[in-house]
Amino acid sequence: MFSKLTNKFKATPTLFYAMSIAATWANAGSFLNGITMSQGSGILPFLLWALGNTLACIVFGIFAPMIPKLRDVFRSKPMKIIMGIMCPFQCWISMNGIQTVFADTVLGPDVGKLIALAFAVFFIIILFKYGMIRNVLTDHISWAAVYALIFGLTVVALCTSHGNYVNLSLGADGVGLGIKNCLLLIPGAFLYPYYFELLDYNDKNEDGTKKIRIRTAFIGGGLLFGFYLAFVFLTSLAVFNPVQNIIKAILVTLVAVSSLSSFQYSIYITFGRKLGLGLNILTAGLWQLLIPLGVMGAWTLMASIRVYIVAAAIIAAFVWHFVEKRRARGAVLK
């Protein structure tokens, strides 16, 4: 199956890239936080949050290939360290999501923990061995399943609610917070090592994969993610029964493992295969030990300041470009 998919991917990679881009951005929180936001904060804050999420990959795809020296800045050691530190937290968010969603089922959180660890170990091995292509293909398969499952779950859950839907407020008083969340989300994709690797992978074309207009893939990825969020909103109206909670847990697991694999691969990209392998094993092994200590508070801080990190990186890229340009002009005059 993978050999046929590999050949198809190499010949027409645009949709595969777009699905992988959407899958990487999703994370477990996109489903769980989306429902919590629409039910707790209201429709308008959810729509603003969804807009920020949809635009994030699109903005990256349009501007990252265009800004001179930006890739060089993000390849620098300080930026690699910053992005590398963020990757384990992203892995833990995915693993936490799997455990949390199974806690609402008869299977319980312990089963969720084992499932999360099993997927983490599986992807550590498969990505170490096969790299980029396997990550793109597994994202494609899992995300296709996500669309099928979320469509079916939404339709069934709304029908079985028999009109007894969750009452969502307009949330006009939360518009200010919604705008803030939207603006904080938009630059977030610039701190995803996997997205920069996709740019380089498309440019190098070392394994014969067809080179494409990569902006199209990122725009497609953003739109695909927005389409997924439309179903998240609809599911927030429904009341789930125990069977549907299990289906929901499977859905969130599929969403979470797509992001989990991309961030595990990002650790390999950032630190190299050998050191990356060790860090991936530590990330999975220390998950249950570190989470009770409150380490996710550090992630909350990093997420809130990432807009400043990205802004500083973009300014540094322009300064670097103009300094080099000035030096080159000076050398010509001499």
Question: Model features per residue range: what roles?
Answer:
Residues M1-L32, L127-L137, W143, L149-L153, ...:
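Membrane-interface "cap" regions at the ends of multi-pass membrane proteins
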Residues A23, L48-Y130, L184, I247-S261, ...:
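Helix-loop-helix module between adjacent transmembrane segments
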Residues A28-Q39, L44, I67, Q90-T105, ...:
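Transmembrane helix-loop junctions in multi-pass membrane proteins
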Residues F2-A11, L137-T138, K274-W287, T300-K334:
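C-terminal membrane-solvent junction of multi-pass transporters and transport-like membrane proteins
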Residues T24, N53-C57, C87, A120-I124, ...:
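Residue-level recognition of pore/gate-forming positions within transmembrane alpha-helices
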Residues P88-I115, F122-A172, I186-G188, L234, ...:
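Hydrophobic alpha-helical segments and their helix-loop junctions in multi-pass secondary transporters
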Residues K8-D72, L183-G188, Y195-V255, L290:
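Membrane-interface helix-loop-helix modules in multi-pass membrane proteins
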Residues R75-M83, P88, L117, R213, ...:
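Loop-to-transmembrane helix boundary motifs in multi-pass membrane proteins
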